[in-house]
Regions:
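Positively charged n-region of N-terminal signal peptides that target proteins for export
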Residues: 1-5
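Bacterial N-terminal signal peptides
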Residues: 9-18
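Oxidative protein folding and maturation machinery
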Residues: 23-182
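Short active-site neighborhood of thiol/selenol oxidoreductases, capturing the structured segment around
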Residues: 184-214, 229-231
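A structural signal for short secondary-structure junctions
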Residues: 189-190, 223-225, 262-266
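Thiol-based oxidoreductase modules, predominantly thioredoxin-like and allied folds used
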Residues: 223-241, 249-259
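Short, internal strand/loop/helix patches
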Residues: 243-276
């Protein structure tokens, strides 16, 4: 499954070792339970990873017994995630569905799971980061019957942000507060490429990036030739944006929208759109 290659090597090492005889169990990191042994007949890494994804939680009572060793649970869950890199997508999807159906019956274990989804799976600095995996869990948790509605809404909202911001997604049209190109909205811009720059108060790197982009001779030339438009995007109170219009680069468009609808985990947050306004 194509998730994040950054931890593929680690996963490969684990699945090759899984099921082999051990002279001694490592003292650390601790896990919740002893992992199942992979049958010797499964020799290919993908087959071994599939087995671990399918059977890792078989003997864990996720439904009735609340986890008390948080570190061990974290180690076990991230090991589970690491197998995804080598496993088939269909196997991963089926396993996540089964896991959620079980863990949804225990609020404590479910909350621990959600905590790791946000600390590791959604974290761009984590080796387990994967928007695809987060969305799989979010969709299954949202479909579960016994899960708190507020938690479902939180996960669904985050999944929607990821969907809005994914490569290939079409950015919804929004009005422009200022447009040197004479366009009323984003869709009115006819350049082959449009850059959305999301302003962020207090972000020094964002300010530096904006200064450099506005001073770029290459970017200015492309704008003059009609090949590029740059939209300076603000969030918050539209009235507060009025005072900032005069400070914007003269050849940039300006917009004020609900910026929370777009992924800004990485700052400066910059989106490059094609002529169809696809990311």
């Amino acid at each position: 499954m194509k998730i994040r290659n950054i931890f593929t090597a680690a996963a490969l090492a684990v699945v090759i070792a899984a099921g082999s005889a051990r002279a001694a169990e490592p003292a650390a990191p601790a896990t919740l339970f002893e992992y199942p042994s992979v049958p010797d007949k499964l020799t290919k890494p993908a087959m071994r990873a599939n087995f671990m994804v399918e059977h890792l939680w078989d003997k864990c009572d996720l439904e009735k017994t609340a986890v008390t060793d948080l570190a061990a649970f974290h180690n076990t869950f991230t090991d589970y995630l690491s197998f995804f890199a080598l496993a088939d997508k269909a196997v991963v999807e089926k396993s996540i569905k089964k896991y959620v159906e079980r863990v949804a019956k225990n609020p404590t274990n479910l909350n621990l799971t959600v905590g790791i989804l946000h600390s590791d799976v959604l974290n761009l600095r984590s080796q387990y980061c994967s928007d695809e995996v987060y969305t799989m869990f979010a969709d299954n948790i949202a479909a579960a019957k016994k899960v708190d509605k507020a938690l479902k809404a939180k996960l669904q909202a985050q999944a929607a942000v990821l969907a809005n911001s994914a490569v290939g997604a079409t950015v919804a049209d929004f009005p422009l507060r200022q447009s040197p190109a004479g366009a009323a909205s984003l869709y009115g811009l006819t350049a082959g490429t449009t850059i959305l720059f999301f302003n962020s108060d207090g972000c020094v790197d964002c300010s530096i990036y904006k200064v450099r982009l506005s001073a770029s001779i290459a970017a200015s030339s492309l704008i003059k030739e009609g090949h590029l438009r740059i939209v300076s995007v603000y969030g918050g109170d539209p009235a507060a944006v009025e005072s900032k219009l005069a400070t914007e680069p003269a050849d940039w468009e300006v917009a004020c929208i609900d910026t929370a609808a777009y992924d800004q985990r990485l700052r400066p947050a910059v989106y490059v759109l094609d002529s169809d306004k696809k990311i």
